[in-house]
Amino acid sequence: MKPLLVVFVFLFLWDPVLAGINSLSSEMHKKCYKNGICRLECYESEMLVAYCMFQLECCVKGNPAP
């Protein structure tokens, strides 16, 4: 009976955790500084120009002027 209670508590608390992750997915691929895109990590052909929320990187294609 006790393991069943633990499973129910875990499932009840898991929903707010997933809600927090969804805010991260809404920030990914969002437009940012100098027409860049927020990503987890910039590609080799892109340059990091700023940081977005949740430590995402704002990436711009090519090598833009400073």
From Swiss-Prot:
This is Beta-defensin 134. Belongs to the beta-defensin family. InterPro entries: Beta_defensin_dom (IPR025933). Has antibacterial activity. One of its GO terms (cellular component) is extracellular region. It comes from the Eukaryota. Disulfide bonds join 32-58, 38-52, 42-59. The gene is DEFB134. It is found in: Secreted. Keywords: Antibiotic, Antimicrobial, Defensin, Disulfide bond, Secreted, Signal. Residues 1-19 form the signal peptide. GO terms for biological process: defense response to bacterium; innate immune response. It comes from Homo sapiens (Human).
